[in-house]
A protein has these predicted regions:
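N-terminal Sec-pathway targeting helices
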Residues: 1-11
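Hydrophobic membrane-insertion alpha-helices, especially the h-region
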Residues: 9-21
Length: 168
């Protein structure tokens, strides 16, 4: 989706929601749902506008939105190979000491157990989220080369879809 079309699309969706909110014959529940959806859209729009392409991000929501918006990881991510070349030892949890505060991300995820959707030509990648130094935690984002973005809070036990298609 063109970057200029996105604000117009958001405005259109908001207008429809507001129209539903004001002109709903059902009242009560429909109005509450419209209000909640409108608030969520406004929050997402504000988050999207506040992300800088040259920024560093570590939280699940920011990293997922960054991948969705820019089709790449933030600058504060390095692959395992790059980390090893800097002297990283996973057992000692010294990543921040050798990398200047970077997080692990960008390596291929094999999806051997086929727990994520498969498609011809689809490749999966992973990155750590909510990393605060020391040993790596269990939280990861898995993202595909065709725009799927998933979150796992428990090292690949459960997966939650965050985004389905990239912004263009």
């Amino acid at each position: 989706m063109n970057k200029r079309l996105f604000p117009a699309l958001v405005a259109f969706v908001i207008a429809i929601i507001i129209g539903t909110f004001f002109f709903s014959k059902e009242g009560g529940e429909a109005n509450k749902n419209a209000q909640i959806l409108l608030e969520q859209l406004n929050k997402e729009r504000q988050k999207s506008q506040s992300l800088a392409e040259n920024g560093s991000y570590t939280s699940k929501d920011e990293v997922a939105l960054y991948i969705y918006k820019f089709n790449k990881l933030p600058k504060n991510f390095i692959t395992k190979k790059e980390a090893l070349e800097l002297g990283w030892d996973a057992k000692s949890g010294n990543l921040w000491q050798v990398s200047g505060g970077k997080s692990i991300g960008g390596d291929r995820f094999s999806n051997r157990e086929k727990r994520l959707p498969e498609a011809d030509g689809r490749k999966w990648f992973e990155c750590d989220v909510n990393y605060n130094g020391g040993r790596r935690g269990a939280e990861r984002i898995l993202y595909s080369n065709d725009g799927l973005i998933y979150y796992t809070p428990d090292h690949y036990e459960h997966f939650y879809l965050l985004y389905e298609k990239r912004m263009q």
